[in-house]
């Protein structure tokens, strides 16, 4: 699930609801996931179903909209392995709790906190560095922008508007002045 956020910039509520039928996972090369629903966790008191999660359309999109997201070979391999190793939930979801239910934020948050203690130094654990799983999505978007992927493409893949993308991530682009100078010099001849 965390790999989907890191490699594909999925929101946690999109990742927990990812179904095998939403995925194109070729033997080699890039794949694709097709996102059409999200499962936000809002609490039983606030859902139509009385469950912890409610099935909704994509954030800030019409209910019937599908967002295709190309995924790199690294994520394709991880998802293929995950399905082979763990199978899928009865409804086809890739990720599930031990009882088959939707993965709760408290569950993946607990795993995330434990992973931070293993992977980071004590000082880093005390810092905001990778403080929450949603930060993986921000890392993905920042990585794409720093790799030179055009903002409209990044926005489309991440499910943002270009306006939101540039407002939130404009300062994450490192070395952009030097790159801009080189491109302008190249165009000037």
Locate predicted features:
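Short pre-functional
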Residues: 1-16, 142-146
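Short, basic (Lys/Arg/His-rich) helix/loop patches that form interaction surfaces
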Residues: 8, 69, 77, 81-156, ...
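Short, surface-exposed helix/turn micro-motifs that flank interaction/cofactor sites
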Residues: 16-17, 155
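Conserved tyrosine-mediated DNA breakage-rejoining catalytic core shared by Y-recombinases
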Residues: 17-84
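Structural detector for helix-capping/boundary residues
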Residues: 18-21, 139, 167
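Catalytic-site neighborhood detector that most strongly recognizes the C-terminal catalytic loop/helix
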Residues: 23, 39, 151, 158-183
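Residue-level detector of conserved, well-ordered beta-strand and adjacent loop positions
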Residues: 36, 72, 96-98, 170
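Intrinsically disordered, low-complexity basic tails/linkers immediately adjacent to helix-turn-helix/homeobox/MYB/SANT
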Residues: 184-189
């Amino acid at each position: 699930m965390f790999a989907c956020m890191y490699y594909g910039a999925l929101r946690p509520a999109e990742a927990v609801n990812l179904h095998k039928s939403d995925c194109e996972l070729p033997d080699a090369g890039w794949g694709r996931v097709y996102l059409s629903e999200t499962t936000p966790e809002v609490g039983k008191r606030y859902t139509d179903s009385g469950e912890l999660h409610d099935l909704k359309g994509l954030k800030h999109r019409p209910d019937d909209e599908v967002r295709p997201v190309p995924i790199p070979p690294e994520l394709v391999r991880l998802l293929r392995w995950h399905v082979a190793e763990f199978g899928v939930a009865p409804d086809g979801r890739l990720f599930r709790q031990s009882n088959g239910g939707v993965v709760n934020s408290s569950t993946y948050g607990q795993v995330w906190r434990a992973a931070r203690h293993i992977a980071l130094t004590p000082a880093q654990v005390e810092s905001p560095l990778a403080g929450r799983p949603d930060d993986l999505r921000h890392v993905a978007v920042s990585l794409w922008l720093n790799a030179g992927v055009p903002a409209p493409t990044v926005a489309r893949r991440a499910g943002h508007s270009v306006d939101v993308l540039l407002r939130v991530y404009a300062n994450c682009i490192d070395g952009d002045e030097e790159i801009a100078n080189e491109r302008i010099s190249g165009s000037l001849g």
